[in-house]
Amino acid sequence: MSDQQQPPVYKIALGIEYDGSRYYGWQRQNEVRSVQEKLEKALSQVANEPITVFCAGRTDAGVHGTGQVVHFETTAQRKDAAWTLGVNANLPGDIAVRWVKAVPDDFHARFSATARRYRYIIYNHRLRPAVLSKGVTHFYEPLDAERMHRAAQCLLGENDFTSFRAVQCQSRTPWRNVMHINVTRHGPYVVVDIKANAFVHHMVRNIVGSLMEVGAHNQPESWIAELLAAKDRTLAAATAKAEGLYLVAVDYPDRYDLPKPPMGPLFLAD
């Protein structure tokens, strides 16, 4: 077939929501369940050809997403309903497409992104939850959310996050730019909301682990600033559990005009 006869290639972006509790992370791996593998299988069924997706951020085992963004290329010409309702019909109940948008050739779910936003949900109660046990992290000591918020503000701007970086992190640099970090209480729930240009491995969970020590009055408010300055992961608290973490939004330049659905999760407004 000559070049003139090649079918056109379409580039499509999707918004994805998933409960990560039954998966070994986003990334496709041999012999274990991954969100990517389930999504690619469903897309391939609708497209009637093999589909490979590229995501904005690869979440770890047990981590959830309400605002994950992916893109893929296909020669299949389908209506939007096929990429949403049709794909959802082929997905397990804990993964769903939220929106679809045709994007130009220069769009890339990861490399076009300008910021990522995560929310970490702590169920702060003496007794553990049952219904949402895989969607929140239980912490039984009373937490002072206002104290946590004040302590976290030293993390704003460009900083070296070595103290909050996993030992096995493969990023070339520990420097990241945090645009906002807010800690708020909603009844028994404490929510840590953090947005940055990018994150080193386990950065949000490591920050939350240390903030909980401050919130429980086990460490002074100044401790977070001291950890940041020390650039030593061994001095910080243990990594917070995966189940409370959600990728809630990814920012892109306005020219792509991607949909911006409510971030959530659950009861949380934007």
Curated annotation (Swiss-Prot):
GO terms (BP aspect): tRNA pseudouridine synthesis
Chain residue ranges for the region called Interaction with tRNA: 168-172
Keywords: Isomerase, tRNA processing
Keyword set includes Isomerase: yes
E.C. code: 5.4.99.12
CDD domains: PseudoU_synth_EcTruA
Catalytic activity reported: uridine(38/39/40) in tRNA = pseudouridine(38/39/40) in tRNA
RNA binding: region residues: 107-111
GO molecular function: RNA binding; tRNA pseudouridine(38-40) synthase activity
Interaction with tRNA, annotated site positions: 58, 78, 110, 126, 139
Family matches, as SUPFAM superfamilies: Pseudouridine synthase (SSF55120)
InterPro entries found in the cross-reference section: PsdUridine_synth_cat_dom_sf (IPR020103), PsdUridine_synth_TruA (IPR001406), PsdUridine_synth_TruA_a/b_dom (IPR020097), PsdUridine_synth_TruA_C (IPR020095), TruA/RsuA/RluB/E/F_N (IPR020094)
Active site (catalytic residues): 60
Pfam families xrefs: PseudoU_synth_1 (PF01416)
NCBIfam families tied to this protein: hisT_truA
Stated role: Formation of pseudouridine at positions 38, 39 and 40 in the anticodon stem and loop of transfer RNAs.
Similarity-based family: Belongs to the tRNA pseudouridine synthase TruA family.
Subunit structure: Homodimer.
Protein name (database record): tRNA pseudouridine synthase A
Organism: Escherichia coli O1:K1 / APEC
